[in-house]
Amino acid sequence: VVWTKGPGSRSFFEDAYLARYLGYTLVQTDDLAVRNNQLMLKTLGGLLPVDVLWRRVNDENCDPVELHSSTGGVAGLLEVLRSGNVAIVNGLGSRLVESPLLAVWLPKIAEYFSLGPLQLPTKPTWWCSDENSFHWVMAHLHEVVILPAFRMGNVAPLYPADMSQAEKQALVHRIRSQPAAFVAQQKIERSTTPVWNGDQVKHWPLALRGFVLGSEGGHRTLQGGLARVAWKPQLLDQSPTSGEKSQDVWIQGHRSAPPTDAASSTAGPITLKRSGTELPSRVADSFFWLGRNIERAEFGARLMRIALQLLLNEREGILEGSRVLRALAESGQIEPDLIVPGMKETLPVLTSSLPRSLFSDDLPMGFRSSLDHVIRLSAGLRDRLSTDSWRIINRMDALCARRPASDLPDVADATELLDMLIS
């Protein structure tokens, strides 16, 4: 299974795409549990053992029992790992190799393993624990970026050149008190790439990530890579995943590459079988409530359209005494006071109150609230929804985007909006 942080993570789309492409089950923390020293997946058919866990969750958030900084995770996971009952891809602690300190020793590491000199030089890095490096950093503080020597969470780099004199003195005091905890790296001028930023093309700094595959036969550098871009270079210095957007890097070739598909890597007939009971129980529950809220939103939209059409045909008097208005109130689409004699006179007229109710957050059972639930639930089911379904939900969200009070639609615009949604 592929263990993701969930729809709130900026990497969730990549996690869902990866799981769907490879045919693996995408799970969140609530889908997993430890029973009898075995990692289990909660499904409709009961608990199923998990043998391989592809971890996409930070180390410190994996096990709240043993990792005291964890606010989530699967209780007992580390004990299962020590017992050898589960294999974890992207093993715990592998984040250590992203520590800036290793850049100091990369040339010597390559020499030790007889790999030859580095083909690409590393960014000049100085460890403040070394006396000569410490004095050089102190003398050139305005030319470097200060980072923690060991990667501990997403700690932002420090830029002495942008600090006040007092802030710079405080930083020097921190480095002097714990020199082994800091490294300094030379500031570099990053290349830029064109980025479409909403309504125009801008040049943003980029950070390029390459990938190397290791096997028994050696290592192979993959063509292309991944670029992270941001509107200012400082946003790219924090970690390999920092930045605001991702861009694929393609190498232009002279001939078409052969098609590859992980799903069709094996030949032979496909055996069809029903496996509904292996569906994670969280997914089944989310699908149930997704369907319920889609039905509720559609019912509210159709009922509201009938009411707006009566207003559009100048039949407000008929609407006030009709069952349509009562049905809207009883289903939570409008304020109940609109049908209470003696109170509706104190409220805005129907021509303004009905269109406003479409975008109201104050109605728990209203159209906007139901649509919010649809968007939230579908985000957690991204790996199981078709592309067409996802486009429809995105279109609904875009059409019904929240608006300021001064920009609310009138009766005609609201009717047209509901026509587009229902059709």
Where are these regions (language model features)?
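Domain-scale recognition of functional cores that engage charged ligands
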Residues: 1-244, 248-261, 281, 305
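Alpha-helical transmembrane segments and their helix-helix packing motifs
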Residues: 11, 15, 104-107, 200-203, ...
